[in-house]
């Protein structure tokens, strides 16, 4: 079997992401139309978002607030003065033939986002800072629905749904600091966590609430000059982002090594074939003929607004991860699992605040409760019948010796389905742990007397038989024996 020759040149990828985050405001960015997803086509429209002559846009202040809060969370510079611009191009889903966006004076500049990369979930993560060039506000375009194909090319006809037109977006542009598909996917996920923690959007990629375009080029390691940049679109999951980038890196390296040209173009990721293919030549910013939006006044962020919005910022996922490690002694893996979803983090903190041991709560949340939520697709931890205070009660019943871990596991399914007080369930069913030394000694004597041959075998060196005796005793006590005390008594009596 032939072995591929090693590459003579080592290459590195230069990657930047343009991320569009759809905001969850009740109304659109420049009019009062609803932003409700899944409404009947063209039902959430008006003369403003359809671009009729003689109408004037008015900025939704919640959009400005969301942009500033996101900028603060990215530790960026907030511009006290900025403006809107018209980005002009033609497409069937753009009724005005221009998009209101921001060009040379964005609301946010010069931020950064720290990501954590681990080869394996159990490995300690490596932290890396990704620069954020800018964040700006803009309106979304409509949505094309193609008949006979999932794209315009090949379709017999297309319908336009303008409900999405005018939905507020934040476009977040990273520096070209990303070097792999894995880093890009983690950067996008950390952005989504921030969006959700701030409460400004849901970040659902499947619904288009979070969309990422990738700009990627390669160059030999050590070379300062960038290679030809290619844009990739049509990735609707984090795994698709990673796979598309990994594929494109290999495609570009192969092209360079075989002397094929790399064109500055837009390529689409095709999930079914797991490859990218050319869509069109890449447009430069000059093609859009930007100029200031004459129908909107300049934007001013006052010191009072900035102070108010900064005071309302929640603890970020990164801040929580750091605090959980230092305050509770949790592993980096556990902190990442707990903080991936804000509701899970708040559930964990509520259980700890109710007096439960943080590490024990972590085990229950990341294992048993997580398994239950995964099994019941659509169920969230907020809707879980077992409330955080009840989980704390269960953990404390184990901690103070009232019940064993085995009993806790037995009553957990009922608690997950119906909720209720673990203590009340234990008391009503007589499930309290047997911790009376005299009672346990009598039971041990009975079991040993009923199995004299195995006792002799144990004393002759077959010490693994202790597990047999423990099993018999747990069966005898219906799992209610204090395991630690039981093992102490059993070991003492087996030694004779």
Swiss-Prot record:
Enzymatic class: ligase
Gene3D superfamilies named in the record: 1.10.10.410, GatB domain, N-terminal subdomain
Reactions mediated catalytically: L-glutamyl-tRNA(Gln) + L-glutamine + ATP + H2O = L-glutaminyl-tRNA(Gln) + L-glutamate + ADP + phosphate + H(+); L-aspartyl-tRNA(Asn) + L-glutamine + ATP + H2O = L-asparaginyl-tRNA(Asn) + L-glutamate + ADP + phosphate + 2 H(+)
Keywords, in A-Z order: ATP-binding, Ligase, Nucleotide-binding, Protein biosynthesis
Pfam families xref list: GatB_N, GatB_Yqey
EC number: 6.3.5.-
Gene Ontology BP annotations: glutaminyl-tRNAGln biosynthesis via transamidation; translation
PANTHER family for the chain: GLUTAMYL-TRNA GLN AMIDOTRANSFERASE SUBUNIT B MITOCHONDRIAL AND PROKARYOTIC PET112-RELATED, GLUTAMYL-TRNA(GLN) AMIDOTRANSFERASE SUBUNIT B, MITOCHONDRIAL
Protein's recorded name: Aspartyl/glutamyl-tRNA(Asn/Gln) amidotransferase subunit B
